[in-house]
């Protein structure tokens, strides 16, 4: 067993010197274990990951926990292998940290449980599967305009407080109830309270038995926040490759992965690139995203919340992620301010699955007509603001009336928000969604008040709400 000594501590980055000829490999895990000898010292059980070889038999490492109490001269042991974590059935219903240690107070994982390294190559080109199958979410705006692909990568883009985490929680709820497969939730750099709430909600709903969770909260050093994504992905890969399962991987929040990388990048001695991000941003993102894919054995469908700093989509962090995604769901602050939830922008959200050969001709035509109507309404808004509705042609007035009904009908109540809104959530099958919007476009509901279309599920609910108001249907 190779031993070394700590020679420098710079926050989360630690330099370790080894004997000549015994340098550990990149990504190897190193251990520091120290028992306090007096009240001024603290017990230390720290894992480091080798990031750089500096020369002169010295390596630069990233700490996977706080470096409080670490001093120069402490002994370091090379484990001879990368960080590994438990995988398989023993991980379901449990919550782990980046090292695969349980943090849910439910007892230890069996010592003989299989452990896989978190650093692994992406599947080979010939192993990949190329069939396209739609994943129904029960959320109208997504299923109609930016449908998700089974085994695809989906990004939920939005600034602070527009509903990314709530949307992810609703997707977990809907897909777990309808799809019933195995889910992995990787939460990093986000609020501990949200993770705790999510765990207890999943426990109460019974979904937790089919879910493995791994957390690296925002109070932790950048090391665990940077590696938790790989830890969660390793859990998902086992179920895909060894059991042939279709796995759902939820990531909240992808931006924090990049942010943690930029925190340690300068300390590792790298020259920062645009906006202070690490120069290896595209490489790190590619290494993560290329492992999330479908193979002949099974699939991993990943749904990733991605924070957009200051609502700027040209920021390098969200911009680098775009090229890897099959579908994007863009959350718009203006829609949230109008009380339209989920605040998904129907014109900015995209999906490569929105094609007639994949979703069918009727679905495609209805979706495109909805987008055309909303786009025309957007163009007319400046005229309306200056001259008012009276100056519009009869045709444009009709477009505006229908567009407003469509805009409101794209909203719906969520199951996971029921405790806040007091309104029951709704799951709408794709066929019902397409039928509802088709009938609105055909003018079947032009006579109903537009506010009745807000926060409902199926189109029949609009009719019932209008009847309750005394409107003739």
Swiss-Prot record:
Under the GO molecular function aspect, what terms does this record hold?
A: ATP binding; ATP hydrolysis activity; proton-transporting ATP synthase activity, rotational mechanism
Q: Taxonomically, which superkingdom?
A: Bacteria
Q: Tell me which family the UniProt entry assigns to this protein.
A: Belongs to the ATPase alpha/beta chains family.
Q: Name one GO cellular component term.
A: plasma membrane
For this protein, the parts annotated as crossing the membrane are none
Q: What does this protein do?
A: Produces ATP from ADP in the presence of a proton gradient across the membrane. The catalytic sites are hosted primarily by the beta subunits.
- Binding of ATP occurs at 158-165
Q: What is this protein called?
A: ATP synthase subunit beta
Q: Where is the signal peptide?
A: none
**What SUPFAM superfamilies does the annotation carry?**
C-terminal domain of alpha and beta subunits of F1 ATP synthase (SSF47917), N-terminal domain of alpha and beta subunits of F1 ATP synthase (SSF50615), P-loop containing nucleoside triphosphate hydrolases (SSF52540)
Q: Which UniProt keywords are listed? A: ATP synthesis, ATP-binding, Cell membrane, CF(1), Hydrogen ion transport, Ion transport, Membrane, Nucleotide-binding, Translocase, Transport
Q: Name one Pfam family in it.
A: ATP-synt_VA_C
Q: Which organism is it from?
A: Geobacillus stearothermophilus
Q: Please state the Enzyme Commission number of this protein.
A: 7.1.2.2
What assembly does the database describe for this protein?
A: F-type ATPases have 2 components, CF(1) - the catalytic core - and CF(0) - the membrane proton channel. CF(1) has five subunits: alpha(3), beta(3), gamma(1), delta(1), epsilon(1). CF(0) has three main subunits: a(1), b(2) and c(9-12). The alpha and beta chains form an alternating ring which encloses part of the gamma chain. CF(1) is attached to CF(0) by a central stalk formed by the gamma and epsilon chains, while a peripheral stalk is formed by the delta and b chains.
Q: Which reaction does it catalyse?
A: ATP + H2O + 4 H(+)(in) = ADP + phosphate + 5 H(+)(out)
Q: How does it sit in the membrane?
A: Peripheral membrane protein
Tell me the InterPro entries matching this sequence: AAA+_ATPase, ATP-synt_VA_C, ATP_synth_F1_bsu, ATPase_a/bsu_AS, ATPase_alpha/beta_chains, ATPase_F1/V1/A1_a/bsu_N, ATPase_F1/V1/A1_a/bsu_N_sf, ATPase_F1/V1/A1_a/bsu_nucl-bd
Q: What class of enzyme is it?
A: translocase
